[in-house]
Amino acid sequence: MELIVKEESKTDYNYGSDPYNRDIKTLLNTGLVVIDKPSGPTSHEVAAWVRNMLNLVKAGHGGTLDPKVTGALPVALGNTTKCVPIWHIPPKEYVCLMHLHDDAKVEDIENIFKEFTGRIHQRPPLKAAVKRSLRIRKIYEIEILEIDGRDILFRTKCQSGTYLRKLVDDMGEALGTSAHMQELRRTISGPFYENEAVYLQDLLDAYIFWKEDGNEEELRKLVKPLEYGLQHLKKIIVKDSAVDAVCHGATLYSSGVSKIEKGIGTDEVVLIETLKGEAVAVGKPLMNTKDMLKTEEGEVVEITRVIMEPGIYPRIWKKRNKNDKTKAESKKK
């Protein structure tokens, strides 16, 4: 990450805090944990267990896994639930065991896998929780790891919302043998990786250790601040004076910008961050990095989702008219 300074600015440490130094109670309400989901429970059940385990009002998962599927399941704690849609932007990766219902030549299998790379058409399966309309999804990578008779172990990196069970069905049909998905494990879920996932029991043990002994060290190793889950986004750093206005949904103006990450375009989502590294909001850039650095006034980012609660930083902005206020409130929903 390369940040370019537009205007040097200092932050007041009387307001806000370093995300990685928040007190443990605040961290639990503005944090996340990546669970290694076991086979059996639904993703909703796992999120509910985490919520009850940590004595929280709410918690939500970032990407449904079927009951039998295992692997990385990010769970948003407390106010972090508003970040979940942002986690779906990067691709997801799976390792799948596919079983053919008849013999097939290795060459034919390899050719079919190549055909299913790139843009594919999918209709969600009968048990899907969404409307079964034809949709386009992108398979970024698909790699055969091992072929053992009728069993094929493969890895794939795909667009969020891709149905792996349907992908296996379609490849089996294309081979002329038919096939089914025998096992599936998610190894990457957006910005989260399998090697950072933790077991539910380990999370419970760490929480009890904190509650009973006052030792929060183990819990801090497992629970990350919400900013950890936004590292995949390019950043715009704003001055303290602009933070509260953005928290109320106001468009970010050039005068409020301190630093800009190199390479920002108008076709992506960017993270608005404080000088301390706190996530304020996400939005759509109205110009690229080069133009943002040049402009002295005007709008630079349209806010699409507010993350930080208003009132953490001082209010240094004028009231807008009622129509602007209504528009800003709609962005916070």
Curated annotation (Swiss-Prot):
This is Probable tRNA pseudouridine synthase B. One of its GO terms (molecular function) is RNA binding. Belongs to the pseudouridine synthase TruB family. Type 2 subfamily. It holds the Pfam family TruB_N. Keywords: Isomerase, tRNA processing. Its EC number is 5.4.99.25. GO terms for biological process: box H/ACA sno(s)RNA 3'-end processing; mRNA pseudouridine synthesis; rRNA pseudouridine synthesis; snRNA pseudouridine synthesis; tRNA pseudouridine synthesis. Residues 233-308 form the PUA domain.
